[in-house]
Design a protein with these regions (language model features):
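Transition-metal
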Residues: 1-160, 236-254, 278-280
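Short, conserved beta-strand element in jelly-roll/cupin
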Residues: 39-43, 50, 82-94, 197, ...
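Short beta-strand His + acidic residue motifs that chelate non-heme Fe in jelly-roll/DSBH
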Residues: 48-49, 57, 206, 212-216, ...
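C-terminal, non-catalytic macromolecule-binding modules
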Residues: 218-268
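Conserved short histidine dyad/triad with adjacent acidic residue
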Residues: 262-264, 277-293, 326
C-alpha cells in the first residue's frame, strides 16, 4: 500500500485498525480479510492440489502444532486453521485439471499402461483406484509409465499432440518434473481427471476436496485467506499421502464452467461460500459507474485508465489495484476501455 512516506503491506495496514479497514461485521466474523486475490501466469504446470475443509484445517493445524512441526517445515501440511476454496477466471486460453473424470473406466480401457488398474476400479471405485495409484512403490510407477512415455514423447516433441489429449500434458510433465530419472506419479492423475479449457472471461469454482492443477495460461484467482495445500503430484515438494486421501472427494465431477466474457459490462461469478465475491466489469471509454462499498474490497484493473473519485481521488492506468474500506462510495470514469474486477465479502 502506497501512502505518505514508506510503503506498507495491506496486512500491516489492516492490523493497524481492523475495525476501520474491515468493518465491525467482517472483523467479528472472520478476524481478518477473509480472502486473497492473485493473478497467475502459468507457464510451467503447477502441482496437483487438494484443499481441506474448515473442520479438517482446524484439526490438522491443531495436531501439527501439538507435534511442534515448524510452520516453515517442508513436511508441514497446515499453515493455518482455515479452508481454501477458490474461484478462478481465465484471462487467456486456460488449461487445468479439475476433479475426477466421469469417464475413468473408458480411460482405463483406452490406455494400455492403465489396464492393470481396471480390477481395483471395478471393485473399489475411484477411492480404491486413486489410493493404489498414490501408494505404488516408485519402481512400479516407473515400470508402468516408461513404455507409454516412450511412445508419446516423440509425438509431443514433434508438436503432433493436441492440448485436449492427456498425452500432451503427460509428456510435458516429463519435461517439467522427471529430471531425477524417475516418473512423477501425478502423471497417472492426468488420465484420471477432467482436462478443461476455459476461454477468457469464463470461470470455475473449486471447493474443498476437489483435486485440481493449473496447466497453462493466465487467470485471476480469488480464494479464502489460507495457505493450506495438500499436494498430490507434479511437484518435487512434500506429498503426505494419508492426509491427501483423507481430504479428497472421490466423486466423478461434471465441470460447472461459469460462462462469461471480458467484454460484458457486468459479469458475476457466483461463489457458494461466504468468504468472498467476485464481479468483473468492462467500462467503455467515457462510461461512468458508481460503486457502494459495504465490505473490505479490492479493485483490480487489468488495463485501461480510470479516474476514481471517493474519499480520495486518483487517476489509475494500466495494471493497478487498490483497497477500499466499508462505507466508501466510489465513482469510476473510464478514460479508455478498461477491464476491472471487484473482490469483496458478500452479505455485508
Amino acid at each position: 500500500v502506497l501512502g505518505q512516506g514508506a510503503s506498507t503491506s495491506l496486512q500491516a495496514l489492516i492490523n493497524s485498525d481492523k475495525a476501520r479497514y474491515l468493518g465491525k461485521s467482517v472483523m467479528d466474523q472472520f478476524g481478518n480479510l477473509p480472502y486473497l486475490l492473485k493473478i497467475l501466469d502459468v507457464k510451467d504446470m503447477l502441482s496437483i492440489q487438494v484443499h481441506p475443509n474448515k473442520r479438517a484445517a482446524e484439526e490438522g493445524f491443531k495436531k501439527e502444532n501439538a507435534l511442534a512441526i515448524p510452520l516453515t517445515a517442508p513436511n508441514r501440511n497446515y499453515k493455518d486453521d482455515n479452508h481454501k476454496p477458490e474461484m478462478m477466471v481465465a484471462l487467456s486460453d486456460f488449461w487445468l485439471l479439475h476433479g475426477f473424470s466421469p469417464a475413468i473406466d473408458q480411460h482405463l480401457d483406452a490406455y494400455g499402461f492403465l489396464h492393470g488398474f481396471k480390477a481395483i476400479f471395478q471393485a473399489e471405485g475411484i477411492k480404491g483406484l486413486y489410493q493404489q495409484v498414490m501408494e505404488l512403490p516408485q519402481e512400479e510407477v516407473d515400470r508402468l509409465i516408461a513404455p507409454h512415455i516412450e511412445v508419446i514423447l516423440p509425438l509431443y516433441e514433434a508438436h503432433q499432440l493436441p492440448k485436449s489429449s492427456p498425452d500432451f500434458w503427460a509428456a510435458r510433465a516429463v519435461h517439467n518434473f522427471c529430471g531425477d530419472g524417475h516418473f512423477d506419479r501425478g502423471i497417472f492423475s492426468i488420465y484420471l481427471f477432467n482436462i478443461l479449457n476455459l476461454k477468457p472471461g469464463e470461470g470455475i469454482f473449486q471447493g474443498a476436496g476437489m483435486p485440481h492443477a493449473y496447466l497453462e495460461g493466465q487467470n485471476i484467482e480469488l480464494m479464502s485467506n489460507s495457505d493450506n495445500v495438500l499436494r498430490a503430484g507434479l511437484t518435487p515438494k512434500h506429498v503426505d499421502i494419508p492426509e491427501l486421501l483423507a481430504n479428497t472427494a472421490f466423486v466423478p465431477t461434471i465441470a460447472k464452467i461459469i460462462p462469461g466474457s471480458l467484454n460484458k459490462t457486468v459479469q458475476l461469478y457466483p461463489c457458494p461460500i461466504g468468504d468472498f465475491s467476485l464481479t468483473a466489469y468492462f467500462l467503455k471509454a467515457g462510461e461512468k459507474m458508481e460503486f457502494t462499498v459495504t465490505s473490505p474490497s479490492i479493485f483490480l484493473m487489468l488495463n485501461g485508465e480510470v479516474q476514481w473519485k471517493g474519499n480520495a481521488s486518483a487517476d489509475l492506468e494500466g495494471a493497478a489495484a487498490f483497497f477500499s474500506t466499508p462505507g466508501e462510495k466510489l465513482l469510476a470514469e473510464a478514460i479508455v476501455d478498461t477491464n476491472l474486477f471487484w473482490a469483496a465479502v458478500p452479505g455485508q
